[in-house]
Amino acid sequence: MKVEEILEKALELVIPDEEEVRKGREAEEELRRRLDELGVEYVFVGSYARNTWLKGSLEIDVFLLFPEEFSKEELRERGLEIGKAVLDSYEIRYAEHPYVHGVVKGVEVDVVPCYKLKEPKNIKSAVDRTPFHHKWLEGRIKGKENEVRLLKGFLKANGIYGAEYKVRGFSGYLCELLIVFYGSFLETVKNARRWTRRTVIDVAKGEVRKGEEFFVVDPVDEKRNVAANLSLDNLARFVHLCREFMEAPSLGFFKPKHPLEIEPERLRKIVEERGTAVFAVKFRKPDIVDDNLYPQLERASRKIFEFLERENFMPLRSAFKASEEFCYLLFECQIKEISRVFRRMGPQFEDERNVKKFLSRNRAFRPFIENGRWWAFEMRKFTTPEEGVRSYASTHWHTLGKNVGESIREYFEIISGEKLFKEPVTAELCEMMGVKD
């Protein structure tokens, strides 16, 4: 099948059907009516306003525009008051400042307060940029809406769509800028094959250059990197996917990949064959939003991984997972058990003062000289990675992220073997260990 034929079929997966479009229009009309009754100044922004939303992902974003003279407290209070008044049902959510998420005629809606500014350089918070983003894109994206949908669908099917910390992928705004810059999905994919970690894409100037990091210049604020939340690994995944797609295009690139789930018995055999120590730190999930939770999980995972390296347990990889009730930090180590004794390096024999200090310590075994340097046998506090992590998490919980650390301090357990394989982490374990279908 030719690329063009594949993309035609892919469009069926990403373009909303007539019913979804009708539902959106009805909700928009009702929302406009309610806002107009309140005499509020507002603007519809985002993928719905620009007709670039993905099939099945209908959500309306409306920004309330307040005068610059309003204090942040006035903006917050008035924004919440209006949001509550115009939605059928609602909940308060938090970004840089609170906003209202809810439903109008069965469609999800975000009502976000911001300042009405003349210039983007005068922004007081990140959301103040959004109306400028919409204004810049509105005319330029016309006629390319489905190209945006193809790119979003391609990214979503491969797990790298969304700038939130849980994903650290491509934002919707970034997708639209790439389509404006390259002109189509296919041209974006062709060119992305040559991206590097130092590629700079300046959309407003229409140029690609080399810089210090992967940087997509915001046409509204040239100092801002639209790709700042995109992780290096997800950039690499996208480049690889683009190369694969151009070598052997197929509709499969637009179909969601289901996480590999295998039976505990098969997982047990895989771990046995690998001869490694596989275990998890399990603790209660802190009651915080994902964008605060996931950076802390990443930090905790990294800190424990570094500890395992220092203690010579030779960790291979780590992963983490948050379920409804619990969080899991997953690790695989090459060393299942290490000797109790190890050798500690001391000073060279010429260093009299430090030699004296080194030899004065009370040890179970005699120190010795090797290649002109003093060495000593010392005893480890723990001989398995599980013992080590139990000790480290108990004493260093305060280094593992504010909320995650507190949760670990209150309760945690180290689980492995059959108990671990019965927890809802099999997909993450398979990914961590590179298990094939």
UniProtKB/Swiss-Prot annotation:
Its EC number is 2.7.7.72. ATP binds at residues 47, 50, 133, 152, 161. InterPro entries: CAA_C, CCA-adding_arc, CCA_tRNA_nucleotrans_2, NT_2-5OAS_ClassI-CCAase, NT_sf, NuclTrfase_I-like_C, Polymerase_NTP_transf_dom, tRNA_NucTransf2. Pfam families: CAA_C, NTP_transf_2, tRNA_NucTransf2. It is an enzyme of class 2 (transferase). Changing residue 110 to A: High decrease in both AMP and CMP incorporation. The keyword Transport does not apply. It comes from the Archaea. The keyword Transferase applies. Disulfide bonds: none annotated. GO terms for biological process: RNA repair; tRNA 3'-terminal CCA addition; tRNA surveillance. One of its GO terms (molecular function) is magnesium ion binding. Its cofactor is Mg(2+). Mg(2+) binds at residues 59, 61, 110. It catalyses: a tRNA precursor + 2 CTP + ATP = a tRNA with a 3' CCA end + 3 diphosphate; a tRNA with a 3' CCA end + 2 CTP + ATP = a tRNA with a 3' CCACCA end + 3 diphosphate. CTP binds at residues 47, 50, 133, 152, 161. Keywords: ATP-binding, Magnesium, Metal-binding, Nucleotide-binding, Nucleotidyltransferase, RNA repair, RNA-binding, Transferase, tRNA processing. Changing residue 50 to A: High decrease in both AMP and CMP incorporation. A single active site specifically recognizes both ATP and CTP and is responsible for their addition. In contrast to the eubacterial homologs, the specificity of the nucleotide-binding pocket is determined by both the enzyme and the tRNA. Belongs to the tRNA nucleotidyltransferase/poly(A) polymerase family. Archaeal CCA-adding enzyme subfamily. PANTHER family: CCA-ADDING ENZYME. Catalyzes the addition and repair of the essential 3'-terminal CCA sequence in tRNAs without using a nucleic acid template. Adds these three nucleotides in the order of C, C, and A to the tRNA nucleotide-73, using CTP and ATP as substrates and producing inorganic pyrophosphate. tRNA 3'-terminal CCA addition is required both for tRNA processing and repair. Also involved in tRNA surveillance by mediating tandem CCA addition to generate a CCACCA at the 3' terminus of unstable tRNAs. While stable tRNAs receive only 3'-terminal CCA, unstable tRNAs are marked with CCACCA and rapidly degraded. Homodimer. This is CCA-adding enzyme. It comes from Archaeoglobus fulgidus (strain ATCC 49558 / DSM 4304 / JCM 9628 / NBRC 100126 / VC-16). The lineage of its organism: Archaea, Methanobacteriati, Methanobacteriota, Archaeoglobi, Archaeoglobales.
